[in-house]
Design a protein with these regions (language model features):
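Short, acidic/polar N-cap/turn motifs at the starts of alpha helices
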Residues: 13, 24-28, 35-36, 113, ...
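Short Pro/Gly-enriched beta-strand edge/turn motifs at strand-loop
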Residues: 9-19, 92-100, 171-175, 236-240
Length: 360
């Protein structure tokens, strides 16, 4: 599936950038193949515009924010770095330095504005009117949990590949054999699956290695422990993984696999824990999950990002019983496309000659 060729994905909120990244001025991002610029407006809220000035098409992300007097600052309106045309969050040009102060600016002088909001420490963007809300993360406002912003990085793969991998119990003994995978137990545990309108809920218990260096992470000292995994999928590209150890420690990971284009995605990952810094240092948790994440990244970047979604296309990819969560993801994506009059677009179609080479 080529995500940029599926219009319905433009109607969902996507986690685009940590708000801390916008503290010092505008930042560019490519979402579903569309170049946008994000900045913090005069009210302290994130805004997103098409990354093109309507004057001579310079990228607005080359500019800076200005206050109502036109003075450079960290927040406010965004000023083009080429000729100084200045835009508010609606995309309207509100100031042209070359004009006399009382000269009216044509309402046609504008660029495209996108839906943008702040939630859970991120700027979220929908390129068109959203048809669903941002998935809830109740732990973000729960005093019983601490929030750790773990990863914000580009991967050379697609959201579909990352999503399916997130629910795949059969790769642990191989991809993660150096971290938590039990090499002697390659047969995966079975998920109990319950579908819902936004995706599905999947629950299982797995074995995990627990060397001394991981004791603070798990809260137990057994060489082999268990992970009670409560996993949830949210259309189109988000998931929640709630890991509970026998100690009662909860290790909750939220992922948004944000589509950059047809060959790249942005990994956005939050971690929530119901212990304290004294129990287990945040850096230890980041280091542990980073090692696991690097193992996933290495193998996923070797796959074809144009993942098969419509399983009626025979002879492209083959599946086994433990792939059921991935097949359910495909089912929900296909139902979503059908509700909006779409079919899967892929590279094999004559009308979709789209390269997937790495970006320069």
């Amino acid at each position: 599936m080529l995500v940029t060729q599926q219009p319905v994905f433009r109607k969902f909120w996507h986690a685009v950038m940590p708000l801390t990244e916008l503290a010092h001025g505008p930042r560019p991002f490519r979402l579903l193949g569309e170049d946008i610029v994000l900045f913090i407006d005069a009210d302290g809220q994130p805004a997103a515009l098409r990354d093109r000035c309507c004057h001579r098409t310079a990228k607005l992300s080359k500019g800076w924010c200005v206050d109502s007097e036109g003075q450079a600052c960290g927040t406010g309106a965004i000023q083009c770095g080429y000729h100084g045309w200045t835009y508010d969050r609606s995309g309207q040009v509100v100031r042209i330095p070359q004009y006399e102060p009382d000269r009216k600016i044509s309402p046609e002088y504008r660029t495209t504005a996108y839906h943008c909001t702040a939630r859970y420490g991120y700027a979220w963007v929908a390129l068109e009117d959203p048809i669903a809300d941002i998935p809830a993360i109740p732990e973000f406002d729960d005093a019983g949990y601490r929030t750790i912003f773990q990863f914000y990085e580009e991967w050379q793969t697609s959201p579909m590949r990352a999503l399916e991998n997130s629910f795949d119990n059969s790769h642990f003994s191989f991809v993660h054999r150096a971290t938590f995978g039990v090499a002697a137990s390659p047969k995966p545990s079975k998920y109990e699956l319950v579908e819902n309108e936004s995706g599905f809920y999947a629950e299982t218990v797995i074995e995990a290695t627990n060397p001394v260096k991981f004791h603070a992470i798990s809260g137990v000292t057994d060489p082999i422990t268990t992970r009670h995994m409560r996993n949830a999928y949210f259309l189109p590209f988000s998931r929640r993984l709630d890991i509970e150890y026998p100690s009662g420690v909860r290790h909750i990971i939220i992922n948004c696999f944000t589509p950059i284009d047809d060959g790249r995605m942005q990994l956005c990952q939050w971690l929530f824990r119901n212990d304290t810094e004294a129990d287990c240092a945040a850096q230890m948790l980041i280091d542990f999950d980073e090692a696991v994440t690097r193992e996933d990244k290495d193998i996923l970047e070797s796959t074809d990002p144009d993942a098969l979604v419509d399983t009626r296309r025979r002879g492209v990819e083959y599946s086994m019983e433990s792939d059921r969560p991935g097949m359910l993801i495909r089912k929900h994506l296909m139902q979503l496309l059908a509700r909006h009059g779409e079919a899967e677009v892929h590279r094999g179609m004559a009308s979709a000659v789209i390269p997937i080479a790495r970006a320069a």
